[in-house]
């Protein structure tokens, strides 16, 4: 049987000093024989997805202690991508993922914790904690803060979200009064932004990976049902500790649960629900931490056979996360994938012996359990609040319409090809990604003229100054993990293209990335990035570029000989932006850039550079 890791600091005469300090935290004699369970919280008043988490760590702690464990809470940082967007603050967003992963490792290993409850929610926090969990490989369970309710206003016929506020603000025909109304209505409650953006996508994927409870990704932050997820997480982590430390059951460890097949399940879910392209970046990073040989080629392979079964904002206006929950949540999508013969159902989860068992219990189309049906009727109250579990509104009926509803069957899929795709070509030899769920079918094949911008800032200025015309392909480069540094999100350029009426008339290609709120022909993660010698750095104004989503290709229509000549010329100049950027790159950002890999590797640290240290 494996010993408790905490035994290192709680047992033996020589640990009298450590025990004295543990006692100062409130531990008693009997506690030194119990598992010490770390609660990694991410409360902050900066982020609406985390503003309500302050007391939830202690809610979990009390449940852990009732079940026989010792709970010790700590906090990580959390960056709000929406607030950090559009200025140099976005340089810090992706690097914060690595800081969060390191912070969890530091706290858990420094104090020899036996297990972890990860209380996450927004864009980089769930991925960072996931990376740490797979790095540490001790019992873990994820429970997120939950999605925000969609906004409501009499000025719109559909639910609102953050992207609506951004688009209307850039629309010169909209009145100041309308902009103000959208601003006040778009984000009405605590929780992660209400569409299938990065935060909600990642929280849904933790269900598919088997590391979170059913409902984790879709139960509203404001709904009282979400409290039960936190309480159950506290009890479950103690049970996982008993199984591992008491019964030597390694099947409960994160690397046993989130193995290669589980990553395939998560990616198939992602493709089926049209998740954020950021999820590709984060799944690749997490797989590397778990030593899982899952890469961009696997994602490309899966994207060709998984249909799109769910469509949510920003890919469609009339559905948000509250509607996904009403339609049965993630386990209904997983159930559809299983019936289609795609899902690996023999895998364990933190709550069930197998995914097959979990689907049978939680898929509303398979179970008659009234408690499960009631759970998925949890809906929005439409009352602005920053308080968790503050309402108990329920829909009168479930959305079990698999022909025309939010979640579809294979036979009635939104499209037979899924919502994410990987493209390859001479402009991105190692690949780039596009959220096809947000691309109008009329522009799945698009040939356009390159319009070069050496930064997101210059692209925004160019778009707002009407320098971009129909038929252009906006190229934003030197915004990758190393070149930015930090791989900024390009939500403002894509939103402004939409507000200028160019959403279906232009494309955008970048070695940066996109917010989960992005839609349109927006292609990111071009690898290698420009700063690493990628061909995106060789494109010139006026070049023709051909994008062919059905054939998964993207090519600069320039001869190999011409590209070779340009490469020789660029090698002499150095792979740097052609224009000076007024950008303060601090020591912290330089340290990140020094080790950063391109997006096809998940933008993780280049471990080869650390070998021998």
UniProtKB/Swiss-Prot annotation:
The PTM N6-carboxylysine maps to: 124
Record's keyword annotation contains Iron: yes
Q: Which GO terms describe its cellular component?
A: cytosol
The cofactor required is: [2Fe-2S] cluster; Mg(2+)
Name the residues annotated as catalytic in the UniProt entry: 515
Which Gene3D superfamilies does the annotation name?
A: IlvD/EDD C-terminal domain-like (3.50.30.80)
Q: What keywords would UniProt list here?
A: 2Fe-2S, Amino-acid biosynthesis, Branched-chain amino acid biosynthesis, Iron, Iron-sulfur, Lyase, Magnesium, Metal-binding
Pathways per UniProt: Amino-acid biosynthesis; L-isoleucine biosynthesis; L-isoleucine from 2-oxobutanoate: step 3/4; Amino-acid biosynthesis; L-valine biosynthesis; L-valine from pyruvate: step 3/4
Q: Which GO terms describe its molecular function?
A: 2 iron, 2 sulfur cluster binding; dihydroxy-acid dehydratase activity; magnesium ion binding
Q: Where does [2Fe-2S] cluster bind?
A: 122, 193
Q: Which domain of life is it from?
A: Bacteria
Q: Does DNA-binding count among this protein's keywords? A: no
Q: Where does Mg(2+) bind?
A: 81, 123-124, 489
Reaction equation(s) it catalyzes: (2R)-2,3-dihydroxy-3-methylbutanoate = 3-methyl-2-oxobutanoate + H2O; (2R,3R)-2,3-dihydroxy-3-methylpentanoate = (S)-3-methyl-2-oxopentanoate + H2O
Going by the record, the broad EC class of this enzyme is lyase
Q: How is the cofactor bound?
A: Binds 1 [2Fe-2S] cluster per subunit. This cluster acts as a Lewis acid cofactor.
Subunit field text: Homodimer.
What protein name applies here? Dihydroxy-acid dehydratase
| Organism per entry | Pseudomonas putida (strain ATCC 700007 / DSM 6899 / JCM 31910 / BCRC 17059 / LMG 24140 / F1)
Taxonomic lineage per UniProt?
Bacteria, Pseudomonadati, Pseudomonadota, Gammaproteobacteria, Pseudomonadales
């Amino acid at each position: 049987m494996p010993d408790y890791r905490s035994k290192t600091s709680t047992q033996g005469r020589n640990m009298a000093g450590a025990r004295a300090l543990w006692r100062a935290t409130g531990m008693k004699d009997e506690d030194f024989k119990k598992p010490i369970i770390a609660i990694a919280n991410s409360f902050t008043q900066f982020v609406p997805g985390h503003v309500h988490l302050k007391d939830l760590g202690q809610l979990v702690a009390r449940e852990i202690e009732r079940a026989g464990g010792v709970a010790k809470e700590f906090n990580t940082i959390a960056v709000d991508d929406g607030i950090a967007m559009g200025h140099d603050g976005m340089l810090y967003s992706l690097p914060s993922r690595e800081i969060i992963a390191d912070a969890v490792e530091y706290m858990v290993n420094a104090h020899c914790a036996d297990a972890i409850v990860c209380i996450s929610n927004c864009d980089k926090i769930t991925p960072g904690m996931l990376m740490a969990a797979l790095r540490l490989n001790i019992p873990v369970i994820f429970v997120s803060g939950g999605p925000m309710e969609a906004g409501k206003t009499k000025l719109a016929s559909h639910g609102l979200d953050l992207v609506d506020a951004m688009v209307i603000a850039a629309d010169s025909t909209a009145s100041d009064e309308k902009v103000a109304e959208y601003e006040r209505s778009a984000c009405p409650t605590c929780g992660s932004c209400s569409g299938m953006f990065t935060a909600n996508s990642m929280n849904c994927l933790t269900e598919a990976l088997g590391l979170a409870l059913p409902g984790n990704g879709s139960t509203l932050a404001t709904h009282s049902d979400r409290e039960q997820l936190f309480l159950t997480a506290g009890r479950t982590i103690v049970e996982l500790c008993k199984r591992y430390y008491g019964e030597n059951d390694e099947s409960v460890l994160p690397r046993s649960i989130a193995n290669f097949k589980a990553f395939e399940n998560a990616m198939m879910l992602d493709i089926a629900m049209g998740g954020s392209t950021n999820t590709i970046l984060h799944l690749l990073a997490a797989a590397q931490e778990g030593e899982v040989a899952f890469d961009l080629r696997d994602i490309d392979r899966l994207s060709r056979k998984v249909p799109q079964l769910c469509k949510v904002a920003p890919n469609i206006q009339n559905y948000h996360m509250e509607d996904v929950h009403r339609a049965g949540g993630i386990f209904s999508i997983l159930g559809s994938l299983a019936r289609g013969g795609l899902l690996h159902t023999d895998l364990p989860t933190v709550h069930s012996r197998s995914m097959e068992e979990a689907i049978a219990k939680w898929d509303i189309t398979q179970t008659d359990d009234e408690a499960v049906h009631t759970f998925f009727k949890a809906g929005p109250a439409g009352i602005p609040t920053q308080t968790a579990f503050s309402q108990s509104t329920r829909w009168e009926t479930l959305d079990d319409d698999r022909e025309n509803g939010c979640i579809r069957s294979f036979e009635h899929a939104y499209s037979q090809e899924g919502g994410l795709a990987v493209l390859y070509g001479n402009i991105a030899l190692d690949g780039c990604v596009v959220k096809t769920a947000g691309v109008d079918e009329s522009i799945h094949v698009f040939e356009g003229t390159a319009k070069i911008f050496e930064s997101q800032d210059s692209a925004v200025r160019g778009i707002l100054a009407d320098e971009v015309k129909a038929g252009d392909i906006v190229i934003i480069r030197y915004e990758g993990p190393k070149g930015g540094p930090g791989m900024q999100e390009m939500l403002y350029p894509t939103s402004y293209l939409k507000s200028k009426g160019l959403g279906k008339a232009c494309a955008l290609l970048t070695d940066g990335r996109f917010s989960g709120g992005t839609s349109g022909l927006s292609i990111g993660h071009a690898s290698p990035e420009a700063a690493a010698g990628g061909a995106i750095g060789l494109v010139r104004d006026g070049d023709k570029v051909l994008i062919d989503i059905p054939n998964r290709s993207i090519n600069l229509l320039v001869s190999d000989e011409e590209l070779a000549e340009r490469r020789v010329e660029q090698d002499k100049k150095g792979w740097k932006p052609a224009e000076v950027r007024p950008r303060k790159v601090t020591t912290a950002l330089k340290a990140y850039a020094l080790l950063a890999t391109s997006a096809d590797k998940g933008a993780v640290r280049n471990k080869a550079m650390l070998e021998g240290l």
